[in-house]
Amino acid sequence: MFEYMKGMIVEAQIDKIIVEVNGIGYRINSSINSASQVKIGQVSTLFTHFVLREDEAHLYGFVDKEELAMFKKLISVSKIGPKVAAGILSTYTPQRLGAYIVSNDAQAIAKSPGVGKKTAERMILELKDKIDDSQVEYDQNFFNHENKNNNEVVDALMALGYTKHEGEQAASAVRDTSLSTEEMIRKALNWLAR
C-alpha cells in the first residue's frame, strides 16, 4: 500500500520514528538500527510495510530496502509477527541474520527478544532457501569458528578409522554452529552409522 515515505523526521525513539509528510505526523514502527540512523530535523526516506490486523493497523519502516526485505521474510514465518520481526532486526543487521540462517545458527538467532530456540529453528527451516549470498555477511571470526569445528570433527573421525572423505561428508551433513565440537562428533558418528 505504501512503498515509502519521504518527510521530515520529527522524533526518533528506540522502536519508532515520527515522520511529518505534508503536515501530517506518521508514527512508523521500526528497528533500533533504523531509528538510530535517522536525524531529527532532516528529510529522510523510509521504506515501509503496512500491517493490517483485525483490530489494528501499523506502519513499519526502515532506512534501507534490505532491512525491509528481511522484515517481510521474517513476518512470512509462522508465529513471527511484525513486532518480533522488528525486534530481531534490532538485534542483527539483515546481512548478519542471513548468515546465521544460512549456517543453521539457531542459538545466535534465539538471542533476539521474543525468539526461543524452536522459533529460531522454524525460522531457519522456512527461510534458508529464501536467503541468497548477497544478503549474507560473514566476518573472519565467523569462518574461523566454523572451519575449526569442522576440521576437529573430520580429524576425530579419521582417528576413529574413517576416511577423510567420509569425515568431510559427515561433518558437512551435521554442521550446526550452535553445537560444541563434541556434540557434532556424536551427530557425525550417528550419521555415519545410519
Swiss-Prot record:
Keywords: Cytoplasm, DNA damage, DNA recombination, DNA repair, DNA-binding
GO BP terms: DNA recombination; DNA repair
Record region (Flexible linker): 143-146
Claim: Transit peptide is one of the keywords in the record: no
Region (Domain II) location: 64-142
Residue segments, region Domain I: 1-63
Gene Ontology MF: a single term: ATP binding
Location of region: Domain III: 146-194
Entry keyword Transmembrane helix: no
GO cellular-component term (any): Holliday junction resolvase complex
Transmembrane segments: none
Main location: cytoplasm
Subcellular location: Cytoplasm
Superkingdom to which the source organism belongs: Bacteria
HAMAP family: DNA_HJ_migration_RuvA
Protein's job: The RuvA-RuvB-RuvC complex processes Holliday junction (HJ) DNA during genetic recombination and DNA repair, while the RuvA-RuvB complex plays an important role in the rescue of blocked DNA replication forks via replication fork reversal (RFR). RuvA specifically binds to HJ cruciform DNA, conferring on it an open structure. The RuvB hexamer acts as an ATP-dependent pump, pulling dsDNA into and through the RuvAB complex. HJ branch migration allows RuvC to scan DNA until it finds its consensus sequence, where it cleaves and resolves the cruciform DNA.
Subunit organization: Homotetramer. Forms an RuvA(8)-RuvB(12)-Holliday junction (HJ) complex. HJ DNA is sandwiched between 2 RuvA tetramers; dsDNA enters through RuvA and exits via RuvB. An RuvB hexamer assembles on each DNA strand where it exits the tetramer. Each RuvB hexamer is contacted by two RuvA subunits (via domain III) on 2 adjacent RuvB subunits; this complex drives branch migration. In the full resolvosome a probable DNA-RuvA(4)-RuvB(12)-RuvC(2) complex forms which resolves the HJ.
Assigned protein family: Belongs to the RuvA family.
Free-text note regarding domains: Has three domains with a flexible linker between the domains II and III and assumes an 'L' shape. Domain III is highly mobile and contacts RuvB.
Name of this protein: Holliday junction branch migration complex subunit RuvA
Organism the protein comes from: Alkaliphilus metalliredigens (strain QYMF)
